[in-house]
Amino acid sequence: MKSNRSRLLFLVVSIAALASLRAVDSGPGKDPATKALSVFSEVFSLTRGNYVDPTDPKTLLEGAYDGMTDALDPFSYYVPAASMSAFRAQQASGAVGPGIIVARRGGFPYVVAPLPGSPAQKQQVQPGDLIHAVDGKNLRNAPLWKITSALEGPEGTTVEVGLFRVVEDKKVTVRLRRERFTPPPLETRWENDLVIVKIPVFTASTAEALRKAIDEAGRRSIDRLVLDLRGSIGGDVADVAPSATLFVGRGPIARIVSRKVPLKPLEATGERVWKGRTVLLTDEATGGPAEVFVAALKDRANATTVGTATAGMAIVQRLVPTGSGGSLFMTVGRYQSPSGTILGGKGLSPDERVITFPGDTESHDPILERGLEVARRGVARRAA
């Protein structure tokens, strides 16, 4: 019955979408949005009256709402009115999760990335893992808010997460502890001719730690710097400005494109300190504040990016209540680089793309190896 219901929801949304497009394209007359709503109403009525099994109007409508938010981006979702009390109660309860950023694409929930230092990262939950179950409950087609709620719970408890690892074509089950955690600190590794700095997440102390590494590089007469931002996700975008300032000096770091919400641009206010060659390592788990940092250094410090495309999470989201009592959690703004590149959505493509494989280990790190090669050869960044 659940399978039939899933197919039914898919058919309702798909038929409504196709019919809406047909109505929009047909001749003059009504406003396209009015036409689309009229067609949707007709499809809804026809489905209720003619589908082989009795249908629940609430189920049909909630499926349509989920389809609508899925069409926006992987991070937006709708919470129905009947679930808002439980949703608010969980938010206010102090519930914690295992440190997984979750999104939905094509109706399937997946791991964007584990948060740095989290139980999920320690248990090697990987970006791109599909989530099919939480504590034995099938959540393959569940809306995003239900998955997030299922992952969270009282601090100190555990949660079992069923994953499908696409790159290895296998199912993986992990038991994760729900706990508060501290992101790991910035790491510095020195070589004879360059310095490698790993930035796990941007915090209030990141700029100071970066400044110390830059000052030490000056004392060692090193003018090549590799910044490893792979897996750097989460944190506060306000902490990006002091760090980016060290590389770009005064001026714009990012602005926010939004239709309705007035948001201030991000500006660097200090002096540029580092003037050597900079290489940035990125992957699919480089997201949010880290993407803003990478884009600013690409545009204004001629930094070269090496690795894979970033997460596309440089966005601003808001919970917007609806008149029916539900709420839309949706993207209301996207960060834009100084040159005008939109960061939220597709993510940033690297200047030097590196293909990676599941068997890659710390002893064979193709992205780092290529980054060191670029830094040492002085390969100039290709135009975007």
Tell where the protein language model's regions lie, with residue ranges.
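Short acidic, Pro/Gly- and aromatic-enriched capping/linker segments at domain boundaries
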Residues: 322-334, 349
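Cleft-lining beta-strand/loop regions that shape enzyme active-site pockets
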Residues: 25-36, 48-52, 56-57, 110-113, ...
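Hydrophobic membrane-insertion alpha-helices, especially the h-region
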Residues: 7-22
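PDZ/PDZ-like peptide-tail recognition elements
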Residues: 63, 74-113
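Conserved functional hotspot residues or short segments at active or partner-binding sites
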Residues: 343-346, 360-384
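An acidic helix/loop motif centered on a single conserved Asp/Glu
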Residues: 55-72
